[in-house]
């Protein structure tokens, strides 16, 4: 029978730990081991004080030791948990932390009885039989739920076709506990690109049927046992274990923090993918303030996606199926909205992205309408809109399905083509489009950021890479991330020239030294569904921030070197 580990410190050990605390400033430390491996490196250990909304995590070193620095844990009773695929704690674990003394908590791990429940999306794709093309169908499923829901289902192919039809009618910011239906003729493009232009066709129907048959071959429709073995990823080692992660719980489990940024005052701002709020969190206390956004279209799904700051520090959000954009004046707390002209709207009108970062140049804010992949522009003073329409690849004549959009320093627009491997540059004055291609075919650029040198950094979702377009050289560099099926969603470059990206599939944050090509992958303590990524350059080392879109929390990762 497993013993509950309410951990105390003996008098002899206390003297040693007090000395270690004085030398290294340790609040809580211990060793993690298992009968199978002995000392275990790369185990993520999390401590959460009773009644707190903030959890702190560290990882074990090559000797299996973990250490929580003094100042990160207040005095009190803490529950401990671990993340190490293939293992569970041998009983409940807790520790009492006291001011001025280092507590010790050695943790014993045992093989898990349910490895399948611990697998990430990437590990499911690595484990399941099938071609890469078959598996890529699932890359549009992880925005609403993990693959656990799919692989644990008992649907046959015909039942999966019914599920597909039902899912196509849900708002992308839906979750199992908070579903929202689309309105009228609006339908989602399952397994496709950015825009609805790909639509329904005989070929597409055949592809959906093939996908349904494949999914029925890897789930539990044939019985309680799977025909394939599991392939978990290795735990982090070396530099990747040198981190501290802080996770802040948000006030409701239904909050979906899609985009997270940190302003010059150190406040954390986030968009809510499933509600009409702009959120602010004080990272010192975890206190959350919500600013309601007025509803524009009654009866339509609610939620916001892209969140950006303009030059005056105002916060903007794209209002998705509400058909507009909103701006929060942080000084007054007032929220102002602008609606897309009614004559341009359909049931599928969707403002997922807005780029106000260079509004100071000409007073214009770029806006993307996912319906038909249209590019629009708002004159903030007059409230007048321009519709630039949709664009085509000059080589293939196929529609450019922009996902992310980013204004450069001159307020020209970068368009990231989620249907192919294009980076478009639109000049609002001439309405001319310049197109550059990544060397990785069908890389599907998703989101990105313009740096101080006016270069565009972007994530290549299907390319499993990040790229950088240099407008001076008119060239693109690419870095493939080390773990298969990471599928980066976004990327940002820090003050040192390191590029940071995250995975919706692996729960790992990748740091790329763009000068040497060295890559470090940090494992987060919980399933995080990483989307928009942000780096706070005011700290040394820099701090990485992301919203846990499915976990109702905000996560900060601090590398220790």
Language model region names:
Residues 40-41, 67-77, 85:
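Short Pro-Gly-centered beta-turn/loop motif in secreted/extracellular proteins
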Residues 268-274, 315-321, 365-371, 413-419, ...:
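Conserved beta-strand positions in repeat-built beta-propeller and related beta-rich domains
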């Amino acid at each position: 029978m497993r013993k509950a580990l309410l951990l105390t410190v003996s008098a002899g050990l206390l003297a040693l730990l007090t000395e270690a605390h004085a030398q290294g400033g340790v609040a809580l430390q211990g060793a993690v081991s298992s009968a199978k491996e002995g000392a275990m490196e790369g185990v993520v250990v999390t401590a959460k004080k009773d009644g707190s909304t903030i959890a702190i995590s560290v990882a074990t070193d090559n000797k299996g030791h973990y250490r929580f620095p003094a100042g990160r844990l207040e005095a009190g009773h803490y529950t401990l948990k671990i993340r190490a695929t293939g293992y569970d704690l041998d009983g409940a674990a807790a520790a009492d932390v006291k001011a001025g003394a280092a507590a010790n908590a050695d943790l014993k791990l045992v093989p898990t009885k349910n490895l399948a429940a611990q697998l990430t999306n990437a590990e499911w794709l690595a484990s399941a039989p099938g071609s890469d093309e078959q598996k890529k169908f699932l890359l549009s499923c992880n925005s609403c739920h993990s693959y656990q829901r799919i692989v644990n289902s008992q649907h046959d192919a015909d039942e999966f076709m019914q599920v597909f039809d039902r899912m196509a009618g849900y708002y992308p910011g839906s979750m199992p506990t908070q579903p929202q239906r689309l309105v009228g003729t609006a339908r989602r493009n399952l397994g496709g690109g950015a825009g609805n232009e790909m639509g329904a066709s005989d070929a597409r129907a055949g592809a959906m049927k093939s996908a349904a048959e494949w999914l029925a071959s890897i789930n539990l429709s044939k019985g309680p046992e799977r025909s394939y073995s599991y392939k978990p990823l290795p735990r982090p080692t070396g530099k990747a274990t040198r981190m501290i992660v802080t996770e802040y719980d948000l006030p409701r489990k239904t909050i979906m923090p899609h985009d997270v940024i940190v302003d010059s005052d150190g406040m954390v701002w986030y968009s809510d993918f499933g509600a009409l709020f702009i959120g602010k969190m004080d990272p010192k206390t975890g206190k959350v303030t919500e600013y309601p956004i007025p509803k524009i279209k009654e009866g339509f799904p609610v939620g916001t996606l892209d969140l950006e700051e303009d030059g005056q520090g105002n916060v903007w959000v794209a209002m998705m199926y509400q058909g507009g954009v909103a701006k929060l004046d942080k000084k007054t707390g007032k929220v102002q909205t602008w609606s897309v002209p009614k004559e341009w709207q359909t049931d599928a009108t969707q403002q997922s992205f807005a780029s106000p970062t260079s509004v100071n140049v000409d007073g214009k804010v770029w806006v993307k309408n996912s319906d038909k992949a249209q590019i629009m522009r708002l004159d903030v003073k007059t409230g007048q809109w321009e519709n630039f329409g949709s664009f085509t690849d000059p080589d293939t004549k196929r529609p450019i399905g922009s996902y992310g959009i980013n204004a450069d320093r001159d307020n020209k627009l970068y368009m990231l083509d989620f249907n192919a491997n294009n980076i478009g540059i639109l000049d609002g004055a001439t309405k001319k489009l310049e197109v550059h291609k990544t060397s990785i075919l069908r890389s599907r650029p998703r989101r990105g950021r313009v740096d101080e040198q006016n270069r565009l950094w972007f994530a290549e979702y299907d390319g499993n890479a990040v790229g950088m377009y240099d407008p001076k050289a008119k060239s693109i560099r690419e870095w493939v991330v080390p773990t298969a099926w990471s599928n980066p969603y976004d990327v940002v470059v820090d003050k040192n020239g390191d590029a940071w990206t995250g995975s919706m599939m692996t729960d790992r944050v990748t740091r790329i030294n763009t000068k040497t090509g060295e890559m470090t992958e940090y494992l987060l303590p919980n399933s995080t569904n990483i989307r928009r990524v942000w780096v706070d350059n005011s700290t040394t080392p820099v701090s990485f921030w992301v919203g846990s879109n499915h976990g109702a929390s905000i996560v900060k990762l601090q590398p220790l070197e």
